From Swiss-Prot:
Gene assigned in the entry: smpB
Record's compositionally biased regions (Basic and acidic residues): 137-159
UniProt protein name: SsrA-binding protein
GO cellular component, as recorded: cytosol
Disulfide-bonded cysteines: none
Location relative to the cell: Cytoplasm
Keyword terms, alphabetized: Cytoplasm, RNA-binding
Cited Pfam families: SmpB (PF01668)
Keyword Lipoprotein carried by entry: no
The protein's role, per its UniProt record: Required for rescue of stalled ribosomes mediated by trans-translation. Binds to transfer-messenger RNA (tmRNA), required for stable association of tmRNA with ribosomes. tmRNA and SmpB together mimic tRNA shape, replacing the anticodon stem-loop with SmpB. tmRNA is encoded by the ssrA gene; the 2 termini fold to resemble tRNA(Ala) and it encodes a 'tag peptide', a short internal open reading frame. During trans-translation Ala-aminoacylated tmRNA acts like a tRNA, entering the A-site of stalled ribosomes, displacing the stalled mRNA.
Record-stated family: Belongs to the SmpB family.
Region listing for Disordered, in residue ranges: 131-159
Transmembrane feature ranges: none
Length: 159
């Protein structure tokens, strides 16, 4: 327990997949818990994680996080974890069924957006149900983003 006078960091983002919003059209987001080992939690608390190349997959009625990188905790000697191991995601049965049906039927993908600690200190992941963008859609969103930047500059200068 933290002392009474200390302030707790609420929703501290540890890792973020910034390219996901550019490469995918986000349909819906879910909050999922992570099944982690002790050294993985300590490594996350140090802020060292990478989910840029990771994805989630449905296997045997469960959702798994694959190819996420949590480096080894340096102070743990031989009881360390494997950095790129598969990690189980904790979702309700209804959410798992909804995600499985969307992925199988509509050809969507499960993309992790960010890993963070909630107000109770638990490691959570924001998981997105997404559809991949085509190349012309990516170009269009990039043009729109550049135009919005130019607009804000013009309004600021002439404001």
């Amino acid at each position: 327990m933290a002392p009474k006078g200390s302030q707790r960091v609420v929703n501290k983002v540890v890792a973020e997949n910034r390219k996901a919003r550019f490469n995918y059209e986000i349909i819906d987001t879910y909050e999922a818990g992570l099944v982690l080992k002790g050294t993985e939690v300590k490594s996350l608390r140090e802020g060292k994680a990478n989910i840029a190349e990771s994805y989630a997959s449905d296997e045997d009625g469960e959702i798994w996080l694959i190819n996420s990188y949590l480096p080894e905790y340096l102070q743990a000697n031989r009881f360390n974890h494997e950095p790129r191991r598969r990690r189980k995601l904790l979702l309700s049965g209804r959410e798992i069924h909804r995600l499985r049906s969307a992925v199988n039927r509509e050809g969507m993908t499960l993309v992790p957006l960010k890993i963070y600690f909630n107000d109770r200190g638990r490691a959570k992941m924001e998981l997105a149900l997404a559809k991949g963008k085509k190349l012309h859609d990516k170009r269009e969103s990039e043009k729109e983003r550049d135009w919005n930047r130019q607009k804000s500059r013009l309004l600021k200068d002439n404001g």
